[in-house]
Amino acid sequence: MASVAYICSLPVNTSRDQVSLATVHRLVFMERSERQKIQLTTNQPYDESFEVNAEEAASVHTPSPRQIVSRRTGRQKQSTMSGYAGEKLEEDTKRKKEPPPGPRGANKNDEEEDEDDDDDDDDDDSDDTESDEEEEEPGSAPEGAYDPADYEHLPVTGEIKELFQYITRYTPQTIELDHKLKPFIPDFIPAVGDIDAFLKVPRPDGKPDNLGLLVLDEPCTKQSDPTVLSLWLSENSKQHNVTEVKVKSIENPEKNPKAIDNWIESISELHRSKPPATVHYTRPMPDIDSLMQEWPSEFEELLGKVNLPTADIDCDLAEYVDMICGILDIPVYKNRIHSLHVLFTLYSEFKNSQHFKSATDGQKSDTPPASRSATAEIERLTLD
């Protein structure tokens, strides 16, 4: 750089050989103090620079282009300039051994060629700096981004091309979501049927509550009655010889009728769930299904003409039982209790039969409603 500055300071009418010899003598015989004073200027993107007085300078600060140039480009230009100075020295030493130069016109052409080479080098350096700046730009498009030039050659209509323009017009918004940890109490889901692990929370007063030992620990809002539960267990286990039975007492039953209703409902449900009692007859009795079969047609025609005997007939109870059991084909022995049991079992089966329920409902819908007094007389049962 010092040699270049010195060459620029020489007069214009000096020849090329004179310039090269002057440059060599200047660099070789330069004093040490002058070499220390020489400083290499930093890389600048422009060839010329000038100083402006502080009064004439604008008040607004404008950053110089050298701030944009990266360190990488500065080092490259420094290496290229140092290499360029070394090449100049080698050319000057070679030209000392060559014969004297030709006419002045050739020297002018050589100078013009050298200037063109310098301009080309400056252009290359500026291109390198621009490419480096483009690489280091933080806002550059990432790899695989949308490029409109890739879709310009598509054979589509103008409306479709307008749709592609919306891609470049769209600017996504960065929305920062606030993530907050909020404490919450999960819903309590009772696990009915799990084994009691006896992990109980003790009472605040420290007294033992015997939860799970004397009282069942059931995860349910509707707690079961211990007395009803013991009755259910004894019924299922067929053990009816339990000596100790806990009986729950209700305080102020007048003010707590709901507890009484619950007790009645639970006991009635217990009785409904019981299987029917089995009776062992001492004499052979017919099957209930066979007794529920239809009568012969001749007997049905006779019943249409002659009604069945009612309780108003002039006879005692034993004779009336024998008469009804004979009509229903139920055998009667000396002990009429078994015969009566079969009779009432047959009546219960007819009452609970779905077939006869639907038949009776159809007859009720066909027949007109009777008066209140007539129904009251029909449902009345007289016992002497």
UniProtKB/Swiss-Prot annotation:
Pfam families: IFT46_B_C
Function: Forms part of a complex involved in intraflagellar transport (IFT), the bi-directional movement of particles required for the assembly, maintenance and functioning of primary cilia. Plays a role in early embryonic development.
Residue ranges that the Swiss-Prot or TrEMBL entry lists as coiled coil: none
Highest rank taxon of the organism: Eukaryota
Name by which UniProt lists this protein: Intraflagellar transport protein 46 homolog
Compositionally biased region (Acidic residues): 110-138
Residue ranges, annotated region (Disordered): 52-151, 358-384
GO annotation terms (biological process): cilium assembly; determination of ventral identity; intraciliary transport; pronephros development; retina development in camera-type eye
Main location group: cytoplasm
Keywords linked to the UniProt accession: Cell projection, Cilium, Cytoplasm, Cytoskeleton
GO cellular component, one term: intraciliary transport particle B
Biased composition (Basic and acidic residues): 87-99
Family: Belongs to the IFT46 family.
Localization terms from the record: Cytoplasm, Cytoskeleton, Cilium basal body; Cell projection, Cilium
Gene deletion effect: Individuals display a number of developmental defects, including dorsalization and formation of ectopic tail.
Stretches with biased composition (Polar residues): 358-374
